[in-house]
Design a protein with these regions (language model features):
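Short, charge-dense linear interaction motifs
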Residues: 1-234
């Protein structure tokens, strides 16, 4: 009877060891399956047309006296207003800012520099672009106009993002399936998504920035979305 005790104890320990080993092996299989993943980059691009424009311009007069500079600036301001009105710019689209004044000279004042700035904001993108193209007529008429290039923006970008992200994700899934099918495996479910920044560029541009690009120089633009999607592999 006493001889059977060590035997029973040994069999019990063996059974426990087998059970523990099975658990470890089982976890190992599950971990391996959990780690069988593939991360694929997908992208989507859409051509859009800007729906808003901002155009900044200014004129500066410099004269020995403030009064002379003010008179000259007033004449040029009237010419600019008249030009913009004739070109079809609406009163609600035009902002005329107050005059800014600087003195010329260090210590002794040698003159005064007065500047008037204007800003046009409008959803009539093509019309304002045409006005900007014709603004050289002011220079030809003796008005020393200083004008920035119009800035063209797209105000509906937030509503476009979901559509592009969905398309980019489908693109990643297609790419992943092609890669995995070539190995005889099966593309599994979604494990994770990393959304990149949106790039808004001029048409067919290859410009890419880590923090995103927002080009305002062209009316037509390309919006590109990029996602990195991780799928399981079976």
């Amino acid at each position: 009877m006493l001889a059977r005790v060590p035997l029973l104890a040994g069999l019990t320990l063996l059974a426990i060891a087998i059970a523990i080993g099975s658990v470890v092996i089982g976890h190992g299989i599950r971990d391996r399956n959990r780690n069988d993943v593939i991360t694929v980059t997908g992208s989507a691009k859409k051509r859009i047309v800007s729906d808003y424009v901002v155009w900044d311009l200014s004129v500066t007069s410099q004269q020995p006296s403030a009064a002379d500079a003010a008179r000259e600036l007033a004449g040029w301001t009237a010419s600019i207003r008249s030009f913009l009105t004739k070109q079809g710019v609406q009163p609600g689209e035009l902002t005329v800012n107050p005059v800014s004044t600087e003195t010329v000279g260090s210590g002794t004042i040698k003159g005064y520099r007065l500047t008037r700035s204007f800003e046009i904001r409008s959803p009539r993108v093509r019309d304002i672009a045409t006005v900007a193209e014709h603004s050289s007529a002011l220079l030809a008429g003796g008005v020393p106009l200083s004008a920035d290039a119009p800035q063209y923006v797209y105000t509906k970008l937030p509503s476009l993002r979901p559509e592009l992200l969905a398309e980019a994700t489908r693109d990643a899934q297609h790419r992943g399936r092609v890669l995995v099918d070539a190995t005889g495996a099966h593309l599994g479910g979604l494990r994770g998504v990393d959304v990149g920044v949106f790039q808004v560029t001029s048409p067919n541009s290859t410009q890419v920035e880590d923090y995103g690009v927002y080009d305002t120089s062209t009316v037509d633009k390309d919006v590109t979305a990029v996602v990195n999607v991780t799928f399981g592999v079976g």
